[in-house]
Amino acid sequence: MESVETPVKDGLLYQQHMKFGKKCWRKVWALLYAGGPSGVARLESWDVRDGGLGPGGDRPAGPGRRGERRIIRLADCVSVLPADGESCPRDTGAFLITTTERSHLLAAQHRQSWMDPICQLAFPSTGECSSGSGQAESPKRGFVPMEENSIYSSWQEVAEFPVVVQRTEATTRCQLKGPYLLVLGQDDIQLRETSKPQACYSWPYRFLRKFGSDKGVFSFEAGRRCDSGEGLFAFSSPRAPDICGAVAAAIARQRERLPELAMSPPCPLPRALSLPSLEPPGELREVAPEYELAPSRKLPLTDPGPQSLPLLLSPTQDGTASSLYASVCKQTSKHKATVEHLYENVFMLEASPGLSNGGPEAQEGPPGGRSPLGSPIYHNSEELSWPGSAHDSNLEAQYRRLLELELDDAGGAGRPGAQTGIKAKLVTLLTRERKKGPAPCDRP
């Protein structure tokens, strides 16, 4: 029983098929039906036999003239496209109908007259193959040109990546292996199991030392402050470059949120344009007394030479005093070099070998416990102090005063031999000082 439906379009087409392993074209009579209460939208084709085309407009003369019927369901169509590269019969154009099951290559003298109604029935909501120019332009009249937002929802699109943990020293220590889900948050990277929403490890962006991707592997170096400890973590994924780019974008966004990180890095301090000038050692001058610094801040301007302070002579184990001390303090002046102070311990111990011929009684100490060998100018009493402005400025007068003190001390001890030695020593020193002509000065 023939169908009572009226086709939307019918006519002669050529359909490609395989015959003995070769591509061949055969003539078919095609009928295009629209969907309705009695059937679905479809394209039916019949083989044409023995040139049985009637004179009534390319229709078969009767049922006996028809061959095998083939049906293409338009609801299963995926695409309807022209096939310009295919070889087809003369004065025809080829077009390809692709369905969910297979593809059909057809040819017609006016292929566009077939493609447009097929597209209208197969894709009714799009209206891509609308034949009227007014219908095609009507939806475009109210269209406002707009651009795609490249960053819209980009964070959500690249938030989660399926990865496989690569074996490294850090992953072995953390007992990580197999597939995981790498989640990129706003502040950190989280590693989650595919079946559990809880994060196994998290690495804040500010604690990552390095990160990068190479040959399908995304890796980063974690710092000591991370929960997993420091080390290299590697994950293989076909979207490794996307993961690396997402991490770089997240770090850039986090840097913008922190004002202290957005500021320019601190510049080094400028070098000093000039340094304090130091004069050569030969040009150093003496500081005036009124500009003299505090004792804790005094700096030696010149080398005054060796000095020794007066010390209290204490007897050794054998009862003899240590060797004699001498101290000479000189002060260098810019104009004239003068002797500031000169003194010498002239006390000679006759009881000591090589200095005197005293007997053993000279080595015995007095009942008071203090050794008589110590000179009065070396003890800490106030009987003798450094010569100042109140004392005689004459050097000879100073030695006479020392002589009187020595004589008083020696007279109390009853040692005439010591007086003779002291006198001889003082005479020698006074004679030597008279020849030099010392200039009197005060002790600083």
Swiss-Prot record:
Domain of life: Eukaryota
Record's GO cellular component terms: cytoplasm; plasma membrane
PROSITE patterns: IRS_PTB
Alphabetized UniProt keyword annotations: Cell membrane, Cytoplasm, Membrane, Phosphoprotein
Residues bearing PTM Phosphoserine: S138, S274, S308, S314, S371
UniProt-listed GO biological process terms: cell surface receptor protein tyrosine kinase signaling pathway; Ras protein signal transduction
Subcellular location: Cytoplasm; Cell membrane
Post-translational modification: Constitutively tyrosine-phosphorylated.
SUPFAM superfamilies, A to Z: PH domain-like
Keyword field contains RNA-binding: no
Residues recorded as bearing Phosphotyrosine in the entry: Y325
Domain comment quoted from the record: PTB domain mediates receptor interaction.
PANTHER family named in the record: DOCKING PROTEIN 3, DOCKING PROTEIN RELATED
Function of the molecule: DOK proteins are enzymatically inert adaptor or scaffolding proteins. They provide a docking platform for the assembly of multimolecular signaling complexes. DOK3 is a negative regulator of JNK signaling in B-cells through interaction with INPP5D/SHIP1. May modulate ABL1 function.
Protein name, per record: Docking protein 3
Organism, scientific name: Rattus norvegicus (Rat)
Gene that produces this protein: Dok3
